[in-house]
Amino acid sequence: MSELCLIPPAGEPIHVEEVKLDRRIIDSADDGRIRSLVAAARQHAEMQTRLQLLHARWQLTLDAFPMYGCLAPFARPSKIPEHAIILPHSPLVKVVSIQYLDMSGALQTMDPADYVVKASNTPALITPQFGKIWPIALPEIGAVTVTYDAGYASPFTVNTTNGQITVNGPVTWNVGDRVQFYGSGGEGYKLPAPLDQDASYLIASAPGNGVYTLSDQAGNAIAFTDAGQGTGRAFIGVVPDGIRSWMLLRVGAMYENREEVAVGQRVVVLDLPYVDGLLDPFRTSLP
């Protein structure tokens, strides 16, 4: 089993300006370093939790479809069926396609009606529809690929002239979908007005190419009065507060302690166990 990120995240869950506010940094001399530390903290958080923070598109490659073992009727019951495909990155947003090489070597795409996706699982599972089995794939490495989108949020920009938002990421929404927003800027930062990160909104229209209009829960159109405070700071979807708080603490520690070792100094290291505990509610494991 191997994975390839086809469309990487279009940004980071926390913005450089939020880190600077948290660290009381008033100039831009270290912006480049802070940006790299944010990326490192995000990668560490994703490694620890097996979560995808910002939306990305992944391709899982298998040598064959999973099948029941020959002793399956007598095997110990398991919460995960032996014939299930397990998607390593969570939370799952959408299975884009399942493709395989048939016995003639031709690439085939499965009909979504032939399989069931359990996105509520962490990690998500895919099994054949009841009464069906996985197709027979060519017995060679990499014969099966599953393309899927995972993550919590994507950055967006606002066009105040036509009242549209443009989302930068692989995930799409349908008319009527309920969405929430958050901003990365720390105290004083505001989403593009009149959006409120404590409220939910509806997708009113989806012309295409990541462009949408919004309405409130009563169906009233959202008319934007400003475009927000810079790009990469407003997100559709919400990355959990605990993960973002952990990232801020991790970036702060790496920024203040720039060396791997301290030479010639008496150093007392005090562990703060609650810090990594911020990630505990979000940790997942692969069977």
Give a label for each model feature.
Residues M1-D196, A204-P287:
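Divalent metal-cofactor coordination and adjacent catalytic microenvironments
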